A protein has these predicted regions:
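Glycine-centered secondary-structure boundary/capping sites
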Residues: 1, 38-41, 139, 168
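Rossmann-like flavin
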Residues: 14-123
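Helical element adjacent to the flavin cofactor pocket in flavoenzyme catalytic cores
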Residues: 98, 129-181
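Residues at the C-termini of beta-strands that transition into short coil/loop
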Residues: 6, 23, 169
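N-terminal FAD cofactor-binding segment of flavoenzymes
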Residues: 1-8
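Residue-level detector of beta-strand face positions
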Residues: 10-12
């Protein structure tokens, strides 16, 4: 059971500690960006439109595949998107954001999702601007009962499927039947 957070998050900026923190609310990002940099609201709309398109493409063709059939990447939707995807795979997130926004606070907000990928905006491909679709357009959600409740729910599902869960033991091997590990 997910609950939308409002605000999704609150940002404190180094060097601006005497100013109130910035609340990032779903559906209000354009207004926030415009208040910090004239013209940034319109540019954010274009940025989020792109993020939404890339997110949809990734969700439909990359996120839920095991890549056993490379031909799946030759889907017409993916092929049509190649001219836009190429630069997003080759360019970095930081430069992608910097080309659109000047205010360092806006750059920090848009670069922050790289943290969830275990990297920095310098290393993350620009394609990962799709993450901004999730926090700025879809909204930040939190599982009722915390993330432990999510783990408990997943454990229940796999137990019902016949999986035996053992904790506090050392794993010495992974056995996979009828297919490679």
């Amino acid at each position: 059971d997910l609950r939308r957070l409002d605000p999704g998050y609150r940002v404190y900026f180094e060097g601006h500690l005497q100013e109130p923190p910035v609340d990032v609310r779903t559906g209000h990002a354009e207004t926030l960006f415009e208040s910090l940099e004239p013209g940034a609201g319109r540019r954010l709309r274009a940025y989020l439109d792109s993020a939404s398109r890339i997110y949809g493409l990734a969700k439909d063709h990359f996120l839920y595949t095991d890549f056993r059939r490379p031909a799946a990447l030759a889907h017409p939707d993916v092929l049509r998107a190649l001219p836009a995807l190429g630069p997003q795979l080759l360019g970095g997130l930081r430069s992608h954001v910097a080309a659109r926004f000047q205010d360092p606070r806006l750059r920090q907000i848009l670069g922050y999702p790289a943290v969830f990928l275990g990297t920095s905006p310098d290393r993350a491909p620009a394609m990962y601007h799709l993450m901004s679709h999730l926090d700025l357009a879809d909204g930040v959600q939190y599982p009722l009962g915390g993330f432990a409740a999510l783990v408990d729910a997943m454990a229940e599902v796999v137990r019902e499927a016949g999986v035996e869960i053992r904790t506090g033991v050392e794993a010495t091997a992974v056995e996979v039947v009828d297919r490679p590990a």
